[in-house]
A protein has these predicted regions:
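Non-catalytic terminal/interface segments that mediate subunit docking, oligomerization
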Residues: 14, 28, 38, 239-311, ...
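Active-site cofactor/cluster-binding pocket
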Residues: 2-266
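Conserved beta-strand edge residues that scaffold enzyme active sites
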Residues: 61, 327-328
Length: 329
């Protein structure tokens, strides 16, 4: 689907109804290099600007640079959006977007029966299936009969959309996350304007990359309109929340602020000792910024040293904390 850089979305020839939902949950899943964290973050930002309350849950592979297409290398980003205040991610997904068979295998169990499953059909070749440990193609085996499956050749369509930019094949393929984002933004009645503006600001020093990502985004949006693959669009109305200034906060940031508050309220100085490991490293980085409150942070050489220094500090009379994640535990 061809789309100029600043073109308006094409008009739908069929009146596709808008279904109003109180809440919805979406997950983007693919290889750790497929940009799923970025895709989820941008859809979250768009949903916030639309007035929804939003809660997110990113998931990273524990392995360092797991082979592409394998189960160990799957990265995903969950978000739940609601017209009411929301406190936790949903137990089951309304929509699952998968970029390859490994992402499908690792995440399908979390999609509700009758949920929408958007699949990059270009990545279901024999070698892709083998790496994901599939003995037969799930697109043909009947395994997906309980879901509303939408197969889209995302890779091919992305390359076609960005062809005019002259990007290499590798760089062109990397834009496919924005194609999938365009599809989902159409599905949930979202404007592309904020995402376009963000792309152009983020890649202002690389105009060809900015143009390619915008083209892919618009192409995904247009594709969802023209192919009539979806029976309805879904609108989650704005949440009714008290007026005021709101901010985005991660669990790690909230935990860090909680540590500062606990230290101040208890009258005890705080020591946080840990070995860096994603995503727990953010706590160490965050607490290091609050040394004006008398906090001390230690970047230990390993997890055993982090635990030992925390235990020793606790015996020494301070409020001692350590943290880790995944294989560190």
């Amino acid at each position: 689907v061809e789309a100029p850089l600043r073109s308006k979305s094409v008009s739908s020839q069929v009146n596709i109804p808008n279904t109003e939902l109180e809440k919805a949950s979406i997950r983007f899943a693919g290889d750790s290099g497929d940009g799923m964290q970025l895709t989820g973050t941008r859809f979250s930002a768009t949903s916030v600007m639309a007035g929804n309350d939003v809660i997110t849950f990113p998931d990273y592979p524990a392995e360092i640079r797991a082979p592409a297409g394998t189960l160990a290398g799957v990265s995903s980003f969950d978000l739940s959006i609601s017209s009411n205040e929301i406190y936790t991610t949903a137990d089951f997904l309304s929509v699952l977007v998968v970029m390859n068979p490994a992402a499908l295998k690792m995440n399908l169990q979390d999609l509700e029966k009758g949920g929408i499953l958007i699949i990059n059909s270009d990545s279901f070749e024999k070698n892709d299936l083998r790496k994901a440990e599939y003995s037969e193609n799930p697109l043909e085996s009947g395994e997906l009969n309980d879901y509303r499956v939408v197969q889209i050749p995302i890779t091919k369509l992305t390359l076609r959309a960005v062809e005019e930019t002259g990007l290499s094949h590798r760089d062109g393929v990397r834009c496919k996350n924005f194609f999938s984002l365009g599809v989902v933004q159409w599905l949930f009645v979202r404007s592309l304007d904020q995402t376009r503006d963000w792309i152009e600001d983020k890649f202002k020093n690389k105009p060809e990359i900015a143009k390619a990502n915008v083209l892919a985004l618009q192409a995904g949006y247009n594709y969802a309109i023209t192919t009539e693959l979806f029976q309805a669009r879904y609108n989650v109305p704005p949440a009714v929340l008290p007026s005021g200034e709101y901010r985005q906060i991660t669990g790690n940031q909230a935990f860090s602020l909680g540590c500062v508050a606990a230290s101040l309220r208890s009258g005890l100085s705080l020591l946080y000792s840990s070995y860096p490991i994603t995503p727990a490293s953010d706590i160490l980085h965050e607490l290091a910024q609050y040394k004006n409150f008398g906090l001390k942070t230690i970047q230990a050489e390993d997890e055993i040293a982090a635990m030992s220094s925390s235990i020793g500090s606790a015996f020494g009379g301070v409020l001692a904390v350590t943290g880790t994640s995944g294989p560190g535990l």
